[in-house]
Amino acid sequence: MKERMRSRMSKQVLTGVVVGAKCDKTIKVMVSRMVSHKMYKKIVKKRKNYVVHDEYNRYKCGDVVQIREHIPISATKRWVVI
């Protein structure tokens, strides 16, 4: 019987700033990116907040962290700190 090789997609890695660290083992990370406006061609800063799993409560507000996609940990957490 032949073994099938599954091709796995690499998980997305983002860099952002911790904006909230009030919950246990959870931080909120804001990721900023620059995009060009389709009509006006102006560079615009877009931001998105991600709820991230922080196993050892290491990070505080203002820290710069890298986060990686993960299987769902809770209803809103789908990212972990690298």
From Swiss-Prot:
Record bears the keyword Ribosomal protein: yes
A GO cellular-component term linked to this record: cytosolic small ribosomal subunit
GO biological process: translation
Residue stretches in coiled coil: none
Example GO molecular function: structural constituent of ribosome
A UniProt-annotated Pfam family: Ribosomal_S17
Keywords: Ribonucleoprotein, Ribosomal protein, RNA-binding, rRNA-binding
InterPro entries, A to Z: NA-bd_OB-fold, Ribosomal_uS17, Ribosomal_uS17_bact/chlr
SUPFAM superfamilies xref list: Nucleic acid-binding proteins (SSF50249)
Subunit structure comment from the entry: Part of the 30S ribosomal subunit.
Family: Belongs to the universal ribosomal protein uS17 family.
Function: One of the primary rRNA binding proteins, it binds specifically to the 5'-end of 16S ribosomal RNA.
Name the record gives this protein: Small ribosomal subunit protein uS17
Species assigned in the record: Ehrlichia ruminantium (strain Gardel)
Lineage of producing organism: Bacteria, Pseudomonadati, Pseudomonadota, Alphaproteobacteria, Rickettsiales
